Amino acid sequence: MKNNEFDFLYYVYKNGLDGYRKIAQSTNISLGVISKLANKFKEIEALDEKGLTPKGIELLKPYKVDNAIIMAAGMSSRFVPLSLEMPKGLLKVKDEILIERQIKQLHEAGINDITLVLGYKKEMFFYLEKKYNVKIIINPEYNVKNNCETLYLARNILKNTYICSSDDYFTENVFDEYVYTSYYASIHVEEKSDEWYMIKNNKNEIIKVNKFGNDGDIMLGHVYWNHEFSEKFRELLIKHHELGDYDDSLWEQLFTDNIKKLPPMQVKTYPSDVIFEFDSLDELRRFDEKYVKNTPSKIINNICRLFNCSANEITDFKPIKEGLTNTSFIFKLNDKLYVYRHPGDGTENIINRKHEKKSLELAKKLNVDPTFIYMDEKEGWKVSEYVKNVRIPDYHNFEDTKRILKVLRELHEHNLTVDWEFLPWEEALKIEDLLNAKDPSTMRNFLPLKEKIAKLVEAVKGDGIEKRFCHCDTYAPNWMLTDNETILIDWEYSGNADPGCDLGAYIMDAMYEVEETEKFISEYLQ
């Protein structure tokens, strides 16, 4: 079936045969062609005076949408702080929950077979299964793989399928019960951005995708795959899942790299006021004024209480790369930048926040960490000053090493003590127990190393080293170097310990050879 034949039949299916001129205006097909199409379909008894006959509906059958997949596994880290408290798809925008609005729009279009692929805070979505009769697939690797994994997990249900993101907002219903061919939704922009720009041929088919651009049709919103496209893309998903070379990639990257091997996908351009994706709280505030004065966020409320400010004064949220145990973001207040540290799930099992707070206060007093402002010892959140133009030390730059060791030497020479200890061996055994409880197989390769460390622990017990206040987690990411300052941050594991812990943590992460280690220790002992 040709495109204009499909457009004619689908229009009549939805609206009836309500005048050739109106059909021509709505489908952008000339009046003469509409007349010819009507005569053609009447001749084969696909059309009568009322509209499509059963035979006409049968002609549309290959183009009927089978189902929809809504991707909702990721954390949406750019959407801090709200994404730290709930998945972005569950935000209420214009008084409707994003993913619920999308499910209802799919239902209105006659698409009832809907599957959600979940990961981050998945339990918060489970109510949708009963409320809207949706199906659920769990992506357990959402935090280490990108959405190629999500689609791989859903590979067996790829047919005539809508691929949607849970956090899109459509001001009008963009879904159809029947679709002619595969397409990627788009809006046309005339300014430079970091979006993905689709280059198309004279058939409106995507022939190339550029990351970044000055103007053009950008990838934005939902996607539709027909049976042919789904079959070929499923083969790619299976192949590259085995190779693992696209684990960190968006599915669009896999598409971009294989455009010439895949069935055609068109660009479907919408007006700029139809499709919205909110990449930050600031963008959402511009769309929904409710979030300006009353942002429903415990984190925002924490900041407001600390600084005695209103929510609309807090702006410019930017995520910082996730740490091993926590997630942090930058925010601006009164033209000054700060860092908010949000404790990771489960960290209460390995970190004593009361001890951490006392350590931070002591480190600030010693000017080892002058950035500290406040920490809530019950909930574990922390606010610090943001330091511009910082870098971490280069393990193989000895000038950096000397700066690090000067700070550690001075810290140890204070010979301070606190009322708790950090015991590396005992703490490691606690973490081992936690990991074993979750998945015993993760520790198999650790046992030979554990036996060696156990002997070392016994050997150093008789050293007679006087314990004192130490940081105990001195690897490079916990240092901030400026032209004039050497700052040691993140005191979660601090306490009374052998000062060798502070040297050993740095040496271990640097993976120094014996000669470099001896040089490092000699510099410390000067």
Q: Residue ranges of each PLM-predicted region?
A:
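ATP-binding pocket architecture of kinase catalytic cores
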Residues: 318-423, 440-447
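Active-site activation/catalytic loop segments of kinase-like enzymes and analogous catalytic loops
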Residues: 500-526
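Active-site acidic catalytic loop and adjacent metal/ATP-binding pocket
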Residues: 318-332, 339-340, 455-501, 515
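Conserved NTP-binding catalytic cores of kinases and kinase-like/nucleotidyltransferase enzymes
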Residues: 264-371, 463, 483-486
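N-terminal nucleotide-binding beta1-loop-alpha1 segment
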Residues: 51-84
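Conserved core of the sugar-phosphate nucleotidyltransferase
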Residues: 7, 171-246
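Conserved beta-loop-beta/alpha segment of the NTase-like Rossmann-fold superfamily
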Residues: 123-196
